[in-house]
From Swiss-Prot:
Biological source species: Edwardsiella ictaluri (strain 93-146)
Subunit and interaction comment: The system is composed of three essential subunits: KdpA, KdpB and KdpC.
UniProt-listed HAMAP family: KdpA
Keyword Membrane recorded: yes
Name listed for the protein in its UniProt record: Potassium-transporting ATPase potassium-binding subunit
NCBIfam families named in the record: kdpA
Length: 565
């Protein structure tokens, strides 16, 4: 088993190291604003038609453009979901969603969370899936990457308040990166058996002689961007555990590579754009080390099996509950770590059925801010927040003004960094407390005790950090959870983007100073160790009490010599 786990993990990392530098080169050109000559005329025509002046913006105008763009997306998607019963491409005749569910879904997909309180095959028309959710899968990913582009330019430029043009960045990210990759990946998925059609559902006769209705739909096209954009919202309720979304071991590997591809490539792009590739490598090392340890922990926990069955003298050969036989324990455990490390939220197994420790690690990866690879764009700007915090702490220890990439880190940047880092944990803990204090929140818990607490904690960890995966034992399709989680998703997304853009605006005005003898090198093993320590320290101090009440308590209960009544 150890050899199989090592081979699976090694193959994933190898494919990423082959593909990501190539994509990183393309992304660095977009960050540097280098136009593609073949598309220059088309772009200029588009700007004129849309009334866009492609001049560079300062951080306030850039931020307002991103916020307005996403607000418009919420309004349009909400209207589409409410009116889907009156619109075409609805062969099953699904009615419009209830208003609170429509709002929750609109906020979820615009914020790149893709939290789903519904089952797609029984709730949404093809038009809603394609023109609504599919479009936002592209645009929400592009928004996160655009914010990162602005922050990288702030580090790379010298005393220049401009950070690029938001509309140009959104267009180029979507057209030059997301669309081509999605087209290629969707064709690979179709070759593996992922369906792509707009036919009505098919009634078939099962082996037992009964009738079964098979859902259809344009799955492959949505599956590709769901993964590449670290969105995670499945076409079907079972997500990537469904054989029409993820039919083979090869498609499963492709999905994991697709989830990590953009976050990895952005690390290479960051190094190229700031003029020192070692900076990107250091961040990639930091992410990779935490990821490898987390993957090993989950694989080990799931291979140990269910303690209840072991107490009965039953050899369970590992914990296969909630997992697909075509993937097995190792691939399911690795997928769980990939999807929660990368803020994707897609699942090929039910996380609620993992062992207590096997479920705790994915939850903790979300709670530390989705910075271990993280979402498209959001993962790297989240990691850069921890870099600034690490530089500040190191500066205090050696008595020097902190600086990073030649730019002084002053009180304003530290305050904004602290604000951005603290908002998601505050949302997780406050939201969980409100849910547990209210009858409407407690009534959705069907598993009392430590596991029920874990389900609530996982839900708010997922929403606040824009992941979207869930412990399925919590009934969240209620007005209480739909509205509260929608608010948490909004603040968790834009409550971080706003201070990140403020930091970018402040850094852009500063000159880059050459490194001196006392400058802390931010690309070596020492800095990587300091950065990992800062991430672990912040995560541990914030969530150890809550985790002790949930998965840790559950693990202690499960490992007792007898089964609890």
């Amino acid at each position: 088993m150890f050899a199989n786990a090592l081979m699976l993990l090694g193959l994933l990392i190898l494919l990423l190291l082959i593909l990501a530098p190539l994509l990183g080169s393309l992304l660095s050109r977009l960050i540097d604003g280098e136009p593609y000559r073949a598309m220059a005329r088309t772009e200029n025509t588009l700007w004129r038609l849309c009334g866009v002046t492609p001049h560079e913006m300062d951080w306030r105008h850039y931020l307002l453009a991103i916020l307005a763009f996403n607000l418009l997306g919420i309004v349009l998607l909400f209207a589409l979901l409410m009116a889907q019963g009156l619109l075409p491409l609805n062969p099953q005749g699904f009615p419009g969603l209830r208003w609170d569910l429509a709002l929750n879904t609109a906020v979820s997909f615009v914020t790149n969370t893709n939290w789903q309180a519904y089952s797609g095959e029984s709730s949404l028309s093809y038009l809603s899936q394609m023109a609504g959710l599919g479009v936002q899968n592209f645009l929400s990913a592009a928004s996160g990457i655009a914010v990162l582009f602005a922050l990288i330019r702030a580090f790379a430029r010298h005393a220049d308040p401009s950070l690029g043009n938001a509309w140009v960045d959104l267009w180029r990210i979507t057209l030059y990166v997301l669309l081509p990759l999605s087209l290629l990946l969707s064709l690979l998925f179709v070759s593996q058996g992922v369906i792509q059609n707009v036919s009505g559902y098919v009634s078939v006769t099962s082996l037992e002689g009964g009738s079964q209705l098979l859902p259809m739909g344009p799955v492959a096209s949505q599956e590709a961007i769901k993964l590449l954009g670290t969105n995670g919202g499945g076409f079907f309720g079972a997500n990537s555990a469904h054989p029409f979304e993820n039919p083979t071991a090869l498609s499963n590997l492709l999905q994991m590579v697709a989830i990590f591809l953009l976050p990895t490539a952005l690390c290479f792009a960051f190094g190229r754009s700031v003029g020192d590739s070692r900076q990107g490598h250091a961040l990639l090392w930091t992410m990779s080390l935490i990821f490898i340890v987390a993957a090993g922990c989950v694989m080990y926990a799931e291979l140990q099996g269910n303690p209840h069955l072991m107490a009965l003298g039953t050899d369970s050969n590992g914990n296969m509950e909630g997992k697909e036989n075509r993937f097995g324990i190792l691939a399911s455990a690795l997928y769980a770590v990939v999807t929660t490390a990368a803020s994707c939220g897609a699942v090929n197994a039910m996380h609620d059925s993992f062992t207590a420790l096997g479920g705790m690690v994915p939850m903790w990866l979300m709670q530390i801010g989705e910075v271990v690879f993280g979402g498209a764009g959001s993962g790297l700007y989240g990691m850069l927040l921890f870099v600034l915090l690490t530089v500040f702490i190191a500066g205090l220890m050696i008595g020097r003004t902190p600086e990073y990439l030649g730019k002084k880190i002053t009180v304003f940047e530290v305050k904004m960094t602290a604000l951005a880092i603290l908002i998601p944990p505050a949302l997780v803990l406050t939201g969980s407390a409100i849910a547990l204090l209210c009858d409407a929140g407690r009534s959705a818990i069907h598993n009392p005790g430590a596991h029920g607490f874990s389900e609530v904690l996982y839900a708010f960890s997922s929403a606040a950090n824009n992941n979207g995966s869930a412990f399925g034992g919590l009934s969240v399709n209620t007005p209480f959870y739909n509205l509260l989680l929608a608010l948490v998703m909004l603040i968790g997304r834009f409550g971080v983007i706003i201070p990140v853009m403020a930091i970018a605006g402040a850094l852009a005005l500063k000159k880059r100073q050459p490194a001196g003898n006392g400058t802390l090198a931010s690309h070596g093993a020492l800095f990587v160790s300091l950065l990992i320590g800062t991430i672990l320290l912040v995560g541990a101090l914030t969530f150890i009490p809550a985790l002790a009440l949930g998965p840790v308590a559950e693990q202690l209960q499960n490992t007792r010599a007898h089964i609890q009544p």
